[in-house]
């Protein structure tokens, strides 16, 4: 038999036809002599009727003993369903297949968990048995949607003159940015390849080579901490263009995303993408990836706060910090004391030292400790600056610039969620431009490239590269959708003198720069066109368009938070022989074989938080998860401590018998038990009557 139809494709127009279906048994109902099977494939579900009068006895016996999720092939006639079995919820609900022949292609063993769509299954279990989880219609739909998004992007780029070119997966390690995944070389002992964090250098070399327009659906790998929107290996749609300026690329990107949206969502984006500079985005929204689905912009009141008598505000203003506020319009009567305390707790979690607030009732009555620190004129000026009206709730943060931005950005999103303002069906794109070229690293005590060392500064800022790096703006840009950064790009440095200055500003000696990027320095000597590019995360875009909660919902085989694969148990130890060939850690490998390390116990922080009734932010989940697993690891290490030769600990109370094995106690004597009873009848103790 050969499959003639998908299970989910049979319709009433096929009635009377002979069809062969293949799929997984999703449900079985034995009515005595007639067995109904729900058979599922990627297109949907078909009802198969196994009647002992129409099926060979052996085939009917198979139908009687089928386990759920067994794979079968069934041949029969498509017919109209009886009225009582009609199912309007299914596309195939009007028809069924009367089986004439049934073959079990693969018998399923009892399942590790329920495959019912409404079953509550732990994510760790679903990821361990990902091949079963992939049978869920929701996940299959997400992966097909992902394919459509990728095809739509490629369709646009192919039509716009781009050439798809693959770049190497085994690259040179350049320790700037995230950590590399390293691959040892067998042929060159002691040397390592790095798996690509992006095709950045290679696509620039393609521009030097005259390819003009390049794109690639590239696999990228970064050894960094995971979040809901981050995986160690991910897919990005990567592109680069020659002889372009920033404006050319921004216009190209807007057309690209509008085309993708039109093709896969069936909707037009009827607005031009707003553009904000990095500074403007930080000032108005507290972050460089603003969610524009709602307003509630941050207002700066530092100058006004500096004139009041509130010591916290004045001290922050005097020390060069910021005092900023968020007006939650119409929330005064909605926010209870508990709500305000919750927001205060969130503010503390974001690093603020507290949260001042003003509550203006609908009647005009004001609740706030702040009012007494302002003169009447100052107070009115403050309310006017904040557009404060009856019914508004205004919250304040006073601290260093970064702390204020982080806190008010987080609180803005918290309030947006409370008020239901972040509609998942509303898609708001924007560009963020003019990022700082450098950011200060407290850990390394030097300036680091905010994007990468190949980003072109603005021409007018070049004189400040060596004298005032914090002042230098880059020709870099991000595309943001609903508060999520989809991707980044920039105009690249194509002049050798500017690239040399950049390396010096980053603290590279000439020898270090040549050791890491010598081939690029040489390439720039032989004629390099002005060029720029962009890359966006395919996984992130799909996650946003589907309204998914995690990248794991749109990737076939994702990693978990510790970058492990629960299905294959990767990473894992390798044989000593493999390491010997690589001339790498031979003794360690031998020891690993003799004494395999125990896996450190871990516990999901979400589970602990739910049990403890805790409400944690994403940052708190990461921090507390690390602390919890550190404690578990410490407890495991304590269990492994050899206490054979450790002297017995001295105690205040006797401890002679604490390690004695338990033995049955001698039975109590009847007379002894009854001796303290006031009265007793036979073997029963008499007690006073308490209730009638």
Give the label of every model feature segment.
Residues 596-601, 606, 614, 629-692:
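Long, charge-enriched, surface-exposed interaction segments in small proteins/subunits
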Residues 23, 257, 609, 628, ...:
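Short amphipathic alpha-helical/adjacent loop interface patches that line ligand
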């Amino acid at each position: 038999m050969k499959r003639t139809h998908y299970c989910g494709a049979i319709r009433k127009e096929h009635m009377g036809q002979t069809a062969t279906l293949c799929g997984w048994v999703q449900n079985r109902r034995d009515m005595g002599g007639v067995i109904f099977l729900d058979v599922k494939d990627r297109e949907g579900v078909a009802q198969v009727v196994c009647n002992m009068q129409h099926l060979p006895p052996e085939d009917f016996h198979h139908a009687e003993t089928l386990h759920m999720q067994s794979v079968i092939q069934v041949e029969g006639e498509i017919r109209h369903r009886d009225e009582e079995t009609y199912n309007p919820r299914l596309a195939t609900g009007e028809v069924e297949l009367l089986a004439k022949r049934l073959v079990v292609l693969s018998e399923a063993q009892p399942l590790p968990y329920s495959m019912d769509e409404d079953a509550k299954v732990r994510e760790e279990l679903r990821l361990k048995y990902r091949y079963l989880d992939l049978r869920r219609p929701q996940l299959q739909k997400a992966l097909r949607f992902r394919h459509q998004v990728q095809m739509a992007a490629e369709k646009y780029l192919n039509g716009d003159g781009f050439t798809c070119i693959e770049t190497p997966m085994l690259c040179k390690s350049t320790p700037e940015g995230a950590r590399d995944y390293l691959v040892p070389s067998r042929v060159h002992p002691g040397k390592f390849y790095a798996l690509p964090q992006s095709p950045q250098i290679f696509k620039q070399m393609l521009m030097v080579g005259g390819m003009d327009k390049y794109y690639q659906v590239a696999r990228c790998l970064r050894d960094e901490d995971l979040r809901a929107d981050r995986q160690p290996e991910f897919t990005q749609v990567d592109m680069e263009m020659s002889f372009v300026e920033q404006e050319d690329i921004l216009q190209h990107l807007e057309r690209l995303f509008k085309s993708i949206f039109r093709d896969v969502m069936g909707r037009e984006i009827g607005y031009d993408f707003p553009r904000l500079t990095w500074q403007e985005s930080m000032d108005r929204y507290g972050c460089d990836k603003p969610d524009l689905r709602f307003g509630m912009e941050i207002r700066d009141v530092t100058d006004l706060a500096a004139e009041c008598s509130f010591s916290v505000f004045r001290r922050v203003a005097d020390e060069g910090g910021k005092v900023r506020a968020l007006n939650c319009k119409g929330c005064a009567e909605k926010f209870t004391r508990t709500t305000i305390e919750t927001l205060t707790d969130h503010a503390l979690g974001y690093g603020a030292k507290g949260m001042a607030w003003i509550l203006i009732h609908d009647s005009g009555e004001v609740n706030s400790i702040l009012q007494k620190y302002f003169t009447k004129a100052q107070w009115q000026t403050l309310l006017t600056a904040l557009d404060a009206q009856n019914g508004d709730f205004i919250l304040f943060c006073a601290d260093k610039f970064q702390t204020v931005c982080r806190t008010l950005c987080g609180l803005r999103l918290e309030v947006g969620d409370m008020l239901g303002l972040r509609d998942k069906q509303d898609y708001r794109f924007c560009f963020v431009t003019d990022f700082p070229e450098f950011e200060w690293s407290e850990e390394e005590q030097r300036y680091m490239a905010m994007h990468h060392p190949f980003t072109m500064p603005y021409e007018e800022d070049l004189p400040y590269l060596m004298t005032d790096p914090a002042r230098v703006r880059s020709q870099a840009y991000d595309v943001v959708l609903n508060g999520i950064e989809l991707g980044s790009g920039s105009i690249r440095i194509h002049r050798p003198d500017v690239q040399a200055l950049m390396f010096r500003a980053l603290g590279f000696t000439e020898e270090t720069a040549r050791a890491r990027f010598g081939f690029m320095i040489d390439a720039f000597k032989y004629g390099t066109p002005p060029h720029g590019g962009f890359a966006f995360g395919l996984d992130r875009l799909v996650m946003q368009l589907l309204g998914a909660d995690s990248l794991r919902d749109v990737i076939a085989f994702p990693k978990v938070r510790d970058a492990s694969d629960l299905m294959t148990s990767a990473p894992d130890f390798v044989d000593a022989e493999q390491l010997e060939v690589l001339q790498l850690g031979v003794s360690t490998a031998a020891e690993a074989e003799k004494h395999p390390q125990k896996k450190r116990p871990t516990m999901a922080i979400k589970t602990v938080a739910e049990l403890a009734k805790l409400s944690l932010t994403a940052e708190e989940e990461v921090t507390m998860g690390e602390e919890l697993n550190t404690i578990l690891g410490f407890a495991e290490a304590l269990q492994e401590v050899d206490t054979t030769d450790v002297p017995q600990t001295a105690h205040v109370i006797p401890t002679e018998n604490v390690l004695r094995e338990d033995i049955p106690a001698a039975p109590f004597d009847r007379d002894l038990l009854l001796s303290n009873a006031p009265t007793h009848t036979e073997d029963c103790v008499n007690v006073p009557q308490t209730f009638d």
